[in-house]
Amino acid sequence: MRFSRSFDIDVENGYGKGMAEFHPATAGIHLPQAGPASSGEAIQRAAVLAEDLGYADVWVSDHLAVPTGADYPPSAYIFEPFIAMTWAAAYTKRVGLGTTVLVLPMRNPLSVAKIVASLDHMSGGRVILGIAAGWLEAEFNALGVPFAERGPRTDEAIEILRRVWTDDHITADFPVHDAHFVSMRTKPQPLRHVPLWIGGHADIALRRAIDVGDGWHGAFLSPEQTERRVKKLREGRPEQSFPISMRTRWDALEDDNDVILAEIDHYREIGVTHFVPEPRQRTLDGYLRAMEIQADLFRRASVSMFDS
């Protein structure tokens, strides 16, 4: 099923005027987990507001260690994602809880599986685990994890997660992680199939999403950059139950709202089905106000605020 809506957009930037067909879409919001506006109170208040406004889900980012220097601004230094998600879960009842994205190969997958299963249980089945192989070599070096092995480690970690979440007893060897399971019990298990949304923009990441993912989660790509990736993803995963998500830098309090509306239309026209904007506000009040305005823009764009 697709929706049609009349819209006026910038012809010079490659968009026409008139009727366009859109895929059904939902919307989440990134929590103030990093930067000047971030705090425990900020995460709590933003999560509660997101639920009140009808957002489908709330999202947090992941870095364990970030180098100093101009290339890594203060906004790169963030609260631990699982703690932030748990904090948000404690104050909400409905919104999904997502990672955008967890750098999976830096972590012990058995530990991740246990944490996610516990959070999924305690939150009532709300976790969306966005994962990727990572890109910051210095971060891997600080953790003593071989950067060159991040691809195979990601693939094997996904296998471990799925096995831990579904098998009552596991006997298996996982050579990349040098992990050996002999009739291991790994309770609790999630309440349901935890969706794995695969992040990354390279062809190998798209192939991973097609082969083993439950969705794809991109970040900060323009509609033009996104289009070829959506085509490739839909060639392998044509079903509409496979979400194509995009994290954006939209700040509805600062940015031209007409431009945001036009970009929503353009993304939807090429097949994006979920949005995660991240306001750039430096104060909590500004962040919350940006969330309110963005929610109104999604409604104006006929984006469902949550998937019922």
Language model: regions and residue ranges:
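Hydrophobic faces of well-ordered beta-strands that scaffold small-molecule active sites
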Residues: 5, 27-31, 58-60, 97-99, ...
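Active-site-adjacent beta->alpha loops and helix N-cap segments on the catalytic face
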Residues: 222-236, 283-292
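Catalytic-face loop-and-helix region of soluble metabolic enzyme cores
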Residues: 230, 234-255, 270-273
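Short, acidic/polar
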Residues: 38-50, 115, 198-208, 255-266
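Catalytic domains of carbohydrate-active enzymes, especially glycoside hydrolases
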Residues: 45-61, 210-215, 266-273
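Active-site mouth loops of central-metabolism enzymes
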Residues: 29-41, 100-110, 190-201, 247-258
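Internal, glycine-rich beta/alpha segment that forms the wall or movable "lid"
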Residues: 10-23, 66-72, 86, 99, ...
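N-terminal beta1-alpha1-beta2 module of alpha/beta enzyme domains
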Residues: 1-91, 189-194, 285, 292-301, ...
